[in-house]
Amino acid sequence: MEKYQSDFIQLAIKHQALCFGEFVLKSGRTSPYFFNAGRFQTGSALAELGRHYAAAITAAGVDFDVVFGPAYKGIPLAAATAIALADEFGRDLPYCYNRKEAKDHGEGGTLVGAPLKGRILIVDDVITAGTAVREVMGIIQQAGAQPAAVLIGLNRQEKGRGELSAIQEVEQNFGVPVISIINLNHIIHYLEHQPGQAALVDRIKSYRATYGVEL
């Protein structure tokens, strides 16, 4: 596990973006952990979060021209990632986001920021059903651009309704990589090295054995 990944886990726990307990998901499953990027609610937390996103995409070595944030959670994540790429990695790239509703006055349209041109990096918090990604792919295609990759905070490595995860389905359907700062295995590895967490690790491993995808 890279330092930026363990630092991200610590940041997420500190801000209660990563919580442990019993959480009923939309799927009806009871999960021993839950991730919510909306808990990064301060300027310093968002700045650090952007640095971790930027580190993950840099480590992946993906070539892209524009950073795109899907409304709504993806908007601050894309902005923070673009800032970190410029400040920390010397890559001053344009960014863009969409509105949920088209604007019929002023600049109009559904897109705000830089034009969608070339290879597009999509930045979001998680992929659950993949619905948001499908919508974004349509926006990118309509603009005449190409998706380069999807960058998210956490890969739960969890089956959807079938044997594949939503992330694996996105990769298969659209032919683009989905890159995450961390995945479930990173969380388990981190907790295994923390005192007094053996019972929690066992619960997470049991959940993974039931719902985890084959990697």
UniProtKB/Swiss-Prot annotation:
E.C. designation(s): 2.4.2.10
Stated role: Catalyzes the transfer of a ribosyl phosphate group from 5-phosphoribose 1-diphosphate to orotate, leading to the formation of orotidine monophosphate (OMP).
Binding site for orotate: F34, F35, T128, R156
Enzyme class per UniProt: transferase
Pathway annotation from the record: Pyrimidine metabolism; UMP biosynthesis via de novo pathway; UMP from orotate: step 1/2
Molecular function via GO: magnesium ion binding; orotate phosphoribosyltransferase activity
Protein name: Orotate phosphoribosyltransferase
GO cellular component terms, A-Z: cytoplasm
InterPro entries given in the database record: OPRT (IPR023031), Or_phspho_trans_dom (IPR004467), PRibTrfase_dom (IPR000836), PRTase-like (IPR029057)
Organism of this sequence: Cellvibrio japonicus (strain Ueda107)
Amino acids binding 5-phospho-alpha-D-ribose 1-diphosphate: 26, 72-73, 99-100, 103, 105, 124-132
UniProt-listed GO biological process terms: 'de novo' pyrimidine nucleobase biosynthetic process; 'de novo' UMP biosynthetic process; pyrimidine ribonucleoside biosynthetic process
Oligomeric form and interacting partners: Homodimer.
Reactions catalysed according to its record: orotidine 5'-phosphate + diphosphate = orotate + 5-phospho-alpha-D-ribose 1-diphosphate
